[in-house]
Amino acid sequence: MSRACPELHWRWLELHDSVSMGSRERRVRTATGTRQWRIHRRAKPRYSVLDERRLHYAAWEGCMEHVKAMLEHGVPANCQDSYGWTAVHHASFKGHLPLVKFIMQTGQVEVNSQDFFNCTPLHRSCSGGNPDTTEFLLQKGASHEARSRSGQTPLHLATANGHLGTARVLLQHLASPNPQDFHKWTPLHWAVFGGWGDVVELLLDNGADVEGGRGVGMSPLQLAVLVGNEAGVRLLLHRGADANTRGPNGQTALHMCACSGDKKILQHLLKGGAKLDIRDGDIASPLHLAARSGSRAVVHLLILNGAGLEDRDNLKMTPLHYTMLRDNAEAAKLLLHYGADVNARERLGQTPLHLASERGHLKVLKVLLDKGANPFVRSSWRETAEDVARTHNHPCILQLLQQHQMLRRRDQDAKERE
């Protein structure tokens, strides 16, 4: 029986070798014979890539017995998969604390070992939301200041995924609440982006800058407006966020809200002291952007709060001009109802009617004509709206303008006869 076991063991190895050996090893195996190859195998134990995958899968599943068997078979505890994850990375992400402790006791894995994205096991534990594993790794010397390839700390990952308990553990170990990643986002930005209100409160209670660092891009409040996080907007304003902080292209949170068309968020911003007369990098007011986006409710609310109907941007365009850009007939009606100049000229002498004719926007063109727009006005290039429609090949627009001009001339002739 004692002689049969080694032979059975060798046959098992031969079966695996037939699949796993490279061409060079096959040549050695054929030339030297079974006996010499057996000695060669014993002198230099090898493990296969398949064994590494088994180790990582066992760590992912939290199977202690399989991990022990793989390590006893000679698979290194610090071997990496195609993403650079070790068994500790896998176990930490899944929160298998006993397994993490066991692998760390082997002494083969550094607690701050990095994968191919420069993430440590602590990063992965925080990403997976495992406070107990996070606590253990921190006690073992894991750095809460370690940065991933994108500049994110473990706290960034915990807050981005809404893991309140894990974020609390990091802050209890004095992790900074205000680090910025390579996109200039702090953990507060990520919590706001994900809509994790409890995490936002935790960060603010532990000293997070409500502005996210001034002058470094978008503020948390602007980000909350951009993603439509009404609760986040309300909370940040309550905690002292400046509604008039400028972000990319000089835009404030009110500009961004005007683009998104969220009336409820707009109401919060106005109550929080947002100014209507601040211009962005294109000298556009919030009303300009609301007119372009076409949100009738937002346009109405801005007008009722005193937004200027005849404000001009860097091209001397009024909010009414902006409604022509996307055929926003309802917004145009509202602006005209409150007294916007239907024949206002921009820098090149074009009226809103010129812009509607250029883009082929039939609905808003009808609104302009119904409100008395003059089709005979010429731009700086001496073109009427009819000339523009003909140049840009909009036959429907051209036909409507010609019909309107005929009616207008008929009315003028009738008045002259009287």
Per-region residue spans from a language model:
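Ankyrin-repeat-protein effector appendages
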Residues: 2-54, 206, 239, 272, ...
